[in-house]
Every structure is written in structure tokens, then in C-alpha cells.
A protein has these predicted regions:
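Periplasmic/extracellular electron-transfer cofactor-ligation site
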Residues: 46-75, 104, 108, 127-135
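Cell-wall glycan
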Residues: 72-79, 90
Length: 140
């Protein structure tokens, strides 16, 4: 998930779509198949965790634009990932960002590529349908 080659390939592929809208892959034919994964991703997004007893929703839905320490909270839209993060000084995956968020709320992070993070990524991608691809974005 974090090898230079994998990130470079993901950036290259998504760069081809830069400026075009993110499209939902859910349609009438696959809705029943994909609905459980979408529901699990949404549940994870809204579920409290860690010593701070916070969910993704508390920061990214209830407080986007506000500051958490020295960072401006985003709306949790993954259309810029993999992204070059100034803190990392190199590109990183959205699963790396998920791990960082879990650490910030004092929760044990899941492994990159885990079912939990994959379902969360799927849910967030569906929420971002209609936004334009920005990969690779730059974040603080």
C-alpha cells in the first residue's frame, strides 16, 4: 500500500482523470452486491473509537474548515489521494491517512489494505461522486 512503485502507479493512473468528475460505480445491477460494503464503510465513519471517543464524522462532517492542532480539517473527500503531504515529505495513500487519524484519536490503527479501511475508502469515494479528481493533491 505504501511502496514507491505502488503509489507512483496509482498517481499515474488517477492523474489521467485529473479534472474529470468522480463517478459512482453503484448502479441498479450491482446495488445489492455493493450495499453491504457501503454500509460497513458508513458505519466505520460514524463509529466512535479510541481514548478520545471520536468518529471520523466528528472532525470531517461536523467541523470541516476548523483547526485541529495546526491542521485545517477537510471534508474527508478522497479525490486527491494518493497525495503529497507536507508532513510526510512524500506521497502517501489514503490508508496511511486513515492510520494517522486513528492514532490521533488514540485508537489502534488497522493495517493498510484492511477490510475496515477498504470499506471506508469505498464509502468516501461514493460521497465524493461529482467532485473532480485532483490526484496528486498537496496537503499539509
Amino acid at each position: 500500500w505504501e511502496s514507491e512503485k505502488m503509489l507512483a502507479m496509482a498517481i499515474y493512473i488517477k492523474l489521467q482523470s485529473r479534472g474529470t468528475p468522480v463517478k459512482s460505480i453503484i448502479n441498479n445491477q450491482n446495488r445489492a452486491t455493493l450495499a453491504p460494503f457501503l454500509a460497513k464503510g458508513k458505519k466505520f465513519f460514524e463509529q466512535r473509537r479510541g481514548l478520545l471517543d471520536m468518529s471520523c464524522k466528528h472532525c470531517h462532517e461536523d467541523n470541516p474548515g476548523n483547526m485541529a492542532r495546526s491542521n485545517v480539517l477537510s471534508m474527508a473527500m478522497p479525490n486527491g489521494f494518493p497525495t503529497y503531504r507536507l508532513k510526510w515529505q512524500k506521497p502517501g495513500s489514503i490508508h496511511r491517512r486513515f492510520s494517522g487519524c486513528n492514532k490521533n484519536v488514540r485508537a489502534k490503527p488497522y493495517k493498510r489494505g484492511s477490510e475496515e479501511y477498504t470499506n471506508l475508502e469505498f464509502y468516501l469515494m461514493q460521497r465524493s461522486a461529482g467532485l473532480k479528481w485532483e490526484t496528486p493533491a498537496v496537503r499539509n
